[in-house]
Amino acid sequence: MSVDIAVVDYGMGNLRSVSKAIEHVAPSATVVVTSSPDVIAEAGRVVFPGQGAARDCMREIDARGLREAIATAARSKPFLGICMGMQVLFEHSEEGDTACLGILPGNVQRFPHEAMHDDRGNKLKVPHMGWNNVHQGAPHPLWSGIEDGERFYFVHSYFVQPTTPDLIAGFSHYPFPFTCAVASGNIFAVQFHPEKSQNAGLTLLGNFVTWNPGEHASACDLSGASCA
């Protein structure tokens, strides 16, 4: 069976809602939820969702032998990371002092307790949970048809800090600006949940299933060259 889109299953994440949302925007595509490295390698596109703790995520990825399959997919085909699937693409997470996949340069930091208050001094809760505006930091095909400042749904206590500003494709505020979307080569990854973000999320997923990364050159070469 030819697989158009593989949704990576490493035992963590709301995989059914992700796969159903993709099937909704791509009804003729073959969408498979899989933990098979071979299926991931054969798929035309890969979606890498996830939720939970970074240490648990990395343990499950390695237990299933998925590390190399994920890295290869990120370097060779359209690849969408979602929530924890975005965070572990980076080098290190403060959560459990966890070494991550190291596909993208940067780290993952917890929202600092001392900064979590609004302009009137009211305490803000962690995790950051609910709808928030997303500002497009750079043009990208996955933003097509989505207004700058559109609202998406978030659930997270940690956020990524890329060491290369050119990676930043979108940001939000809680209560300070933080990166919520990155783009590099074949990779687009988001902190929010497009599958829970109604029309805006479905638009982004629809853009992903038709995206040809070769038509959108990235400033960062994943083969190992430095980012310009």
UniProtKB/Swiss-Prot annotation:
* Main location class: cytoplasm
Report the catalytic activity: 5-[(5-phospho-1-deoxy-D-ribulos-1-ylimino)methylamino]-1-(5-phospho-beta-D-ribosyl)imidazole-4-carboxamide + L-glutamine = D-erythro-1-(imidazol-4-yl)glycerol 3-phosphate + 5-amino-1-(5-phospho-beta-D-ribosyl)imidazole-4-carboxamide + L-glutamate + H(+); L-glutamine + H2O = L-glutamate + NH4(+)
Q: Which GO MF term does the entry hold, naming one?
A: imidazoleglycerol-phosphate synthase activity
User: Where does this one sit in the cell?
Assistant: Cytoplasm
* GO biological process, alphabetically ordered: L-histidine biosynthetic process
Q: What pathway is this protein said to act in by its record? A: Amino-acid biosynthesis; L-histidine biosynthesis; L-histidine from 5-phospho-alpha-D-ribose 1-diphosphate: step 5/9
Q: What is its EC number?
A: 4.3.2.10, 3.5.1.2
**What is one GO cellular-component annotation here?**
cytoplasm
**Matching SUPFAM superfamilies, A to Z?**
Class I glutamine amidotransferase-like
- Residue ranges of domain Glutamine amidotransferase type-1 in the record: 4-218
Q: Does the keyword Protease apply?
A: no
Q: Which UniProt keywords apply?
A: Amino-acid biosynthesis, Cytoplasm, Glutamine amidotransferase, Histidine biosynthesis, Hydrolase, Lyase
Where are the catalytic residues?
83, 193, 195
Q: How does it assemble?
A: Heterodimer of HisH and HisF.
Role summary: IGPS catalyzes the conversion of PRFAR and glutamine to IGP, AICAR and glutamate. The HisH subunit catalyzes the hydrolysis of glutamine to glutamate and ammonia as part of the synthesis of IGP and AICAR. The resulting ammonia molecule is channeled to the active site of HisF.
Provide the protein name.
Answer: Imidazole glycerol phosphate synthase subunit HisH
Gene (name only): hisH
